[in-house]
Amino acid sequence: KPELGPQQLQMVMSSTGRNCLALGTAADANINTAADLRGKRLPWVIGSPALQTNVTAFLAYGGLTWDDVTKVEVGGFDEAWKAILNNQADAMTSFTSGGGTELDASPRGLHWLSTPHSETENWERMQAVAPHMAKRIATFGTNLSADNPLECGGFPYPILVTSPDRESDLVMNMAKGITEQFDSFVSAEPAAGGWATERQNFQWVLPYHAGAVAFWKSEGLWSDADEAHNQNLLNRQAVIAAAWEGLE
């Protein structure tokens, strides 16, 4: 077996911005709900499991699979959006802050598909495909603002991770240093606000390092529910690591 198996990475903190990963649709395709994707033309980016999974997750949200849509094979992310512009496809995933501007200015127009947080069963189907997707409200991106928000999902980026054997004091002071210096760098670029303490997600897909937990507890932000979630993730990592060691 390969020498490098599952790595027990642990979180320190992360940045959750005001954008989200959404499905951008051509406005003239009249896709108002995920169920409306049935029969539409969706890009399949050859050789990119990550991009394929993103689109698959939105199909799952609507209770659909690739059998319910027309698959349009494309060579990359940019080609997927060009296919929409050229009326060869109808929708593609993107961060709201980094895509959609050209489509919005085109005759087809842009419509971001909302994934309402109250639709619990839909979210369960989406997260079964893409467990890293977490609920959020986007106010940053093409056609989005505080007055025109989008109920959607996304994941923290960038994330600050470390190994379990890193000294707790070092990890704690790293989180403390970033938090204390937040006001000094928050205006450096639009996404920097995602490092704010109130934008941390303590129940994501990676467990937090003991030093980070100590810091967030000292800030009064770490709950019993966070602790239970963290222990489950740590146990999961231990099981996966043990299973790897047992492989021949």
Residue ranges of model-derived segments:
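A structural signal for short loop-to-beta-strand junctions that line the ligand-binding cleft
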Residues: 2-16, 141-151
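Residue-level detector of short coil/turn "hinge" positions at structural boundaries
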Residues: 6, 66, 91, 223-224
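Extracytoplasmic
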Residues: 6-7, 18-20, 39, 107-110, ...
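Structural motif
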Residues: 9-11, 22, 91
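Bilobed "Venus flytrap"/periplasmic-binding protein-like clamshell domains
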Residues: 18-86, 97, 202-215
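Pocket-lining segment of extracytoplasmic ligand-binding domains
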Residues: 29, 66-170
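Ligand-binding clefts/hinges and TM-proximal coupling segments of bilobed small-molecule sensing domains
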Residues: 47-57, 132-200, 204-205
